Regions:
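Phosphate-interacting basic helix/loop segments used at nucleotide- and nucleic-acid interfaces
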Residues: 4-6, 72-79, 83-99, 220-234, ...
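Flexible glycine-rich surface loops and low-complexity tracts that mediate binding to linear polymers
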Residues: 1-12, 17-21, 159-170, 279, ...
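Short, surface-exposed beta-strand-loop junctions and turns on beta-sheet-rich folds
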Residues: 111-113, 122, 183, 263, ...
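Short secondary-structure boundary/capping segments
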Residues: 20, 34-37, 120-125, 263, ...
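Charge-lined substrate channels and their catalytic hotspots, especially those that engage the 3′ end
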Residues: 1-105, 112-157, 189, 194-197, ...
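Catalytic nucleotidyl-transfer cores of nucleotide-processing enzymes
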Residues: 144-183
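Append "with occasional cross-activation on large, charged helical scaffolds in nucleic-acid assemblies
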Residues: 158, 167, 179, 192-466, ...
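Single-stranded RNA-binding regions, centering on S1/OB-family and related RNA-binding modules
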Residues: 15, 29-40, 101, 384, ...
């Protein structure tokens, strides 16, 4: 249920509240998304004034809007996205230059043309700050008439865009760039898999299907190879982490799941987006315009110390924290590329990173090994990108400081707000993913799978399954025939009688013992250690993860229930407590399990990153800023202090000035 607390708890009793909505008789997979939206207090209903503003937006580009813009409709720009994507932020085009090198055009949806500073659309977009993506469902930052309509770079229709036009030399370095407003027309809506089949695998059917834009795709692929080499030379960290995706049935239940791997088409787009983001950051920094930058700091000293201790178990070394560079991480990844512990070591390296965040000043990006970085390429789904567009347009169209809508102080407050909203969305996404994993495992209780030990604690082993990447606990009570002692220094469990050892990176076979959708816990039973590790390569298994019955708005309830204003405020916190926002205890998987308090076996601070991040049966590690600038990958979260008022700073008033026309903030 969704309940609103009317009386807070006291020392004698718990809180008292009123039920505002009934989600279902029991927690089912189909309710997981709705519960996450409520418990994380995600705005998902549009205020009337927002819908009114959205309805006033033109559904097609007009002749008046084309005036003053560069016409690039004849260029064969294409969009390359996932098969289930609906909001197309970016389109790309590349051509060889005389004398060598390339011209790369990255065209980004001109959301700032339609969302004016301070109007209802803008205020709601700022409050949300980001779109939140769940399997088969999205809570968008902008109404669908914009996010899936006039702002989306759909094929064969004119769209307004902001362009980053770059010259790139044969070594993959951007030698010059410029920004300008344009009107474009996407010549094809392509998917990563189709592009990879055509230019990577040279599949005849795929090449025939994309024949109209095949020369353009081959140009992009050739350019990507140069940019990838440049990325390697500068030492950017390249984490190859599979993404777990779910296929849902018509009722919202989990039909199948598995891990997907990136191909060159994903990386091609990533490099194009990164290049445009860098140029946006350099453009704004040079002109000293208040804007948001994307900052990623070097690893925190404490986490780096844990990492070094972990690596010593695998005979690996890294320099001191004050000397470490992104290239040092890349070198370790290269060294373990063919080792059976590759994925474990890579995951621990990744979780040792600091969190990326928005900042009002440029601090560089450690993970990408870049001196300047901003988010420019996804204004449909990220508010900071919209702010960057406004800053660039101000620089292109005005020389008067009074024409700019934001002060440095306002931008600093917005950086905190947007970072907090990003963490909230990530927590909600992770919550749903973990519950869907539990729902999938509920169907496989008794089944056996291969996995690797990713955490060792005093109370058992955490094991990640090879194919699905699901993690669960082998409680120490399931390690039979001996009494095991935990070695906190070497991070292993050792049998008192047999001397048998379990340590990080061990390959084991487990049986699914129990899975709880309510508390997001999965328990395994150890079947046997494996004598050999799997080859450190991709599974090669193909999945179709386009969600069945795609939903882009919450389903309406059959029985209407009166909802009080603000029901997703205090009620959200109650639901969060009821459904495990905090880590619940780990229960010993015995026939009659005794639930222990969460503090019975707290993960020690001396444990390696892998162990701490799996404590409680969940991956809680912080993720490095993804190399991709597409839909964000999941990473960790942290509270970053009190949020400022969830309203964007109002545009400054300058006695008697008329409002700026659209697109001229």
């Amino acid at each position: 249920v969704v309940a609103e607390i009317t009386d807070p708890p006291t020392s004698q009793r718990g809180p008292i509240g009123e039920i505002r909505a009934v989600l279902g008789e029991r927690l089912q997979p189909s309710l997981v998304v709705e519960m996450a939206i409520a418990s994380h207090d995600l705005p998902h209903e549009w205020p009337a004034e927002v819908l009114r503003d959205a309805a006033q937006v033109e559904s097609a580009v007009t002749a008046a809007e084309r005036e003053g813009r560069t016409d690039i409709r004849q260029l064969p720009l294409v969009t390359i996205d996932g098969a289930d994507a609906r909001d197309f932020d970016d389109a790309v085009y590349a051509e060889p230059r005389r004398g060598g090198g390339w011209r790369l055009i990255v065209a980004i949806a001109d959301v700032s043309h339609y969302v004016q500073v301070g109007n209802a659309l803008d205020r709601e977009a700022y409050e949300r700050s980001t779109s939140t993506y769940f399997p088969g469902f999205v809570v968008p930052m902008l109404p669908e008439t914009l996010s899936n309509g006039i702002c989306s770079l759909m094929p064969k229709v004119e769209r307004m865009c902001m362009v980053c036009d770059m010259a790139i030399d044969a070594e993959g370095n951007v030698t010059k760039s410029k920004f300008y407003d344009a009107v474009m027309l996407s010549h094809a809506r392509l998917t990563y898999d189709k592009v990879w089949q055509a230019v990577g695998l040279n599949d005849a059917d795929a090449r025939h299907e994309v024949a109209d834009v095949l020369p353009q795709l081959e140009n992009l692929h050739a350019l990507y190879k140069s940019m990838a080499q440049q990325r390697k030379r500068r030492g950017a960290i390249d984490f190859e982490t599979p993404e777990v995706k779910f296929r849902l049935d018509q009722t919202g239940g989990v039909e199948s799941m598995g891990a997907t791997e990136r191909n060159d088409a994903h990386k091609l787009i990533e490099e194009c987006m990164i290049a445009a983001n860098v140029q946006a950051a350099l453009f704004l920094e040079k002109r000293k315009i208040p804007a948001l930058f994307r900052a990623h700091e070097p690893p925190p000293a404490e986490k780096y110390e844990d990492l070094q201790q972990f690596l010593r178990e695998f005979k690996l070394r890294m320099p001191p924290v004050d000397e470490v560079t992104p290239g040092d991480f890349s070198e370790v990844l290269r060294m373990v590329k063919d080792r059976p512990e590759r994925e474990l070591i890579q995951n621990v390296l990744l979780r040792s990173q600091s969190m990326a965040a928005y900042q009002p000043d440029n601090r560089g990006h450690f993970g990408l090994s870049l001196q300047a970085y901003a988010h420019f390429t996804s204004p449909i789904r990220r508010y900071p990108d919209l702010l960057v567009h406004r800053a660039i347009r101000y620089a292109l169209t005005s020389r008067k400081p009074t024409d700019y809508s934001y002060t440095p102080a306002e931008m600093a407050a917005m950086a905190v707000h947007c970072s907090q909203r990003e963490r909230r969305a990530e927590e909600a996404e992770r919550d749903v993913d973990e519950r869907f994993k539990c729902a999938w495992m509920e169907k496989h209780i008794g089944s056996e799978f291969d996995g690797v030990v990713t955490g060792v604690t005093s109370f058992g082993l955490f094991v990640e399954l090879d194919e699905s990447k699901v993690s669960g606990l082998v409680h120490i009570s399931q390690l039979v025939n001996d009494y095991y002692h935990f070695d906190a220094v070497r991070k292993l469990l050792k049998g008192e009688r047999t001397g048998a050892q379990f340590r990080l990176g061990d390959h084991v076979r487990i049986q699914v013992l129990r899975a709880s959708l309510e508390d997001r816990k999965i328990d395994f039973r150890l079947v046997s250690p494996r004598t050999s590790a799997p080859a450190p390569t991709g599974s090669g298994k193909a999945y179709d993860y386009a969600a069945a019955g795609e939903r882009y708005s919450l389903p309406k309830k059959a029985a209407a229930t009166t909802k009080a204003p603000g029901m997703f405020g205090r009620a959200a916190k109650a639901i969060g407590r009821a459904f495990g926002r905090k880590e619940a205890e780990v229960a010993a998987p015995a026939p009659a399990p005794r639930k222990a308090a969460a503090s019975d076996n707290p993960p020690s601070r001396a444990q390696p990153p892998a162990a701490r991040q799996h404590a409680g049966g969940q991956h809680q590690g912080r993720r490095v800023e993804p190399s991709s600038d597409r839909r964000p990958r999941k990473d960790g979260s942290a509270r970053r202090g009190p949020a400022p008022a969830a309203v964007p700073p109002a545009p400054k008033k300058h006695g008697g000035r008329k409002p700026k026309p659209k697109g001229k903030p």
